[in-house]
């Protein structure tokens, strides 16, 4: 379903938080939404892989990578795993790699920057905890909406039929 974050902000101005405009789109889907699942890690993606193995239908993975852009937390293999398991999208407060492959996958991916260096594969980090970046706090079970214009967050699902 097509979403327009600008229109959603107009309709739900008092209900949504707007993430600072620091992200670029790298996936093959330009707009996506779903229930938030969080991971907090630093330059390692083992825990990300574990979470992406879960059923992702109706879910968006929000990764707090500390804003580090020295290693790509999401690569083509992890993005394909997300597609295979039905994830709607991935937001990375950090870097991604293999962007030529990412843009051909049927998933939304927003991140700070691309870099060719891979993350280590340790499972260090935490999941399903509140994470804070971009001027907002993301809680597991919040709802996130993203398009090429921006990313917004709501505690309740928004009516997309308006």
Curated annotation (Swiss-Prot):
Record keywords: Cytoplasm
Residues of the signal peptide: none
Main location: cytoplasm
Annotated GO CC locations: cytoplasm
GO biological process: regulation of RNA metabolic process
Keyword match Cytoplasm: yes
Keyword RNA-binding listed: no
UniProt-annotated location(s): Cytoplasm
Family: Belongs to the RraA family.
Function: Globally modulates RNA abundance by binding to RNase E (Rne) and regulating its endonucleolytic activity. Can modulate Rne action in a substrate-dependent manner by altering the composition of the degradosome. Modulates RNA-binding and helicase activities of the degradosome.
Protein name per its UniProtKB record: Regulator of ribonuclease activity A
Record organism: Haemophilus influenzae (strain ATCC 51907 / DSM 11121 / KW20 / Rd)
Gene behind the chain: rraA
